[in-house]
Amino acid sequence: MDMFNKVTAFLQQALETREPSINLLESFVDHWKAITNYYIETTDESRAVKNTDIPWRLRQMLDILVYEEKQQGEEAGPCMEYLLQHKILETLCTLGKAQYPPGMSQQVMVFFSKVLSHIQKPVLHLINVYRPVQKLINLCGLPHSQTEKEESQFLFAVCTQVNKDPYVLNYILEIKNDSLKRSSSTSDEAAEKDCSGSSSPERASSPSSSSSACSLLSRSGAHPVSSPQEATGMIPVLLHLEKSEKRRVAHRSLESLLLLVSSTQEDTGHLLAERTPLCDLLAQRLTELYLLIPSTIDPADIHSFSVVQWRTRFTQDSTAESQSFPGSENVYRFFCFLDLCNELIKQAPKVLGVKMARALHSQWLKGVIQPHLLQMSEVGILVHTTLLSCSVRHIHSPALLEELVQFMLGSDTDSETRQHLHTHLLRYRLIEHCNHISDEISITTLRLFEELLQKPNRRILSNLVLRNLENRSYKLPGTGASDERLRVESDLLDESEELEEDPFFPDMYDDSGDSNHEPLLSLPNVRERLNPNLHTQVVDTVNSFLCLVPQEAKTSHLVQGAGYDTYVHDAHKVFKECTALVRDWKWPDSAKATVNNPSTDFYEGHFLHILFDRIARILEQPYELNLQVTSVLSRLAVFPHPNLHEYLLDPYISLSPGARSLFSTLVRVIGDLMQRIQNITNVTDRLVVIRRQLMGLDEESMVDHMTLLKGVIVLEEFCKELAAVAFVKLPTEEQ
């Protein structure tokens, strides 16, 4: 029993003599005093900060603040109050600016970053926090800085806090507005009062203001370093760090910029748009990168350049070998930054996004690209048209796309006239370049328009084509489809004796078993359904295009793999894309009544006029140029607008005097073709040889009439493509 009592007494004594809990405030103050005492006692000015205990003590102070916050809950703890009242952050900022001991600014930025990121309660709106943060921001981005990594981490922490609470941006940007007031969990007034006039034991024994820090520095012989940087502020610094050769630094700076602008509050957007140089600096940087692209670059390399995303620049293998060519690094950096601008504009509040897009329009598009597109040098036109085409491919933000359309096409909405084509100079020049004496410029500019037609902006198609077709003045009023079929057939018969012998190629319906014709020739089987008239019209339209090319000029059925089933598949895919593109554009389902205005001659517009002129010369033009012209026209034909469909795909419309349609233009080409091939012996065999060469089945060899024969093959393929487009535009339930 005595032994049991002794053990019990021992345990009781142990419980009563527990070690008392650590006083966090005392420990916090001790660490801070140890740091300040270093400046009083040290005599070695060359000793690096990493060889002192300052970094360790700063880490201990941070740990105490984090632990205290977890224990205190909503209320600010005594250590945080001490940090604020004694302006510790202000003092650290001054010590960091002096770079004493050497490397101190690095430690200060790390401490600031961790305070902002680890402390959960908002503190950035407090005067004794945001003022030193402002000063530390102005120490970032200095020339030849050795602290880029720490600067980027610090700015990322600041931007993260701004993203969480956009209101604090007013403090960070030093924008004074008496109407901007808010309550805080810690009293600013109490902190200011305590820092300005009160005296406490802690304050008396611990230097806490910037003046105290300067006093410490003067005792130790160190002096604050003046900043040689002209442009200060968070945004200029972030864009300065974007140029860093260190990938992580550049990446983090751009992520910070994205955090800064991606606010849902319009007030923040107004603030960044009107009170900061963000928009101008972005445009300047993009322009700078564009001008770094060498003028001797090969346009073919740019055309084949795939779309890049700005974050891929910071991956280990940022540029693929397939995209490596002389000047590729400059091209790559430019398009990465263009993608970043797209992302910033999309994420920003509307007012800021529009302002950024307009800055890019003014400085980059109009200030740099336009003069190059309007110059006389063919080499310059070719390079910059290709760069613009690739830029169109990269642009995906609605606001920037709107500015691009305004830049290229203008804002005219009235129907075009032949007398007023120069209302928008760049639009006129670009369309004229589609008919340039240089085939390369023509091909490149046609590619530019093809890229433009794939963008989700209704003004593009309206400006280029639809505004000239909306009144249907290309069509004689009061004419029926059946009468027009007879007229077109009569025109075909009169065109040539060959067409008279076989106007619609009845061999299409024979039992030869040609699999190439199966998909479209299955259509007559559905004429017995509930809507036979619709099917009859579609079948007639499809066969009208299929039968345009005379039999002796057809070769697709003679070479395996040249059928039009592929065209049907491709047309269906493109039609789905175009339908999705225009879903919200509220296009009419059917064409409206013809407006009869005999005093006004129909003009298809500058763009279609050039395209029709080009297709009329298909037998005389280079193969690559023909491919591009037909590609643009087939893209236009796919769009589900009733007027556009009627004008490009209906063979039976009764055209008004002087008007031409795509089908009537092709009929004239066929008439020219019939005359030309009469003088060529074994024309079908020659065409088969050329077709096999184009398909890569045979090696290339010189053949007489090469341009003409290639033109015939493109013509046949184009007619098959238009037939496929007409077929896939049938309602799904009717196919």
Swiss-Prot record:
Q: What is this protein called?
A: FHF complex subunit HOOK-interacting protein 2B
Enumerate the residue ranges of region (Disordered): 183-229
Q: Can you tell me which residues the record assigns to a coiled coil?
A: none
- Disulfide pattern: none
- Family, similarity comment: Belongs to the FHIP family.
The UniProt regions of compositional bias labelled Low complexity, in chain numbering, are: 196-221
Domain of life of the organism encoding this protein? Eukaryota
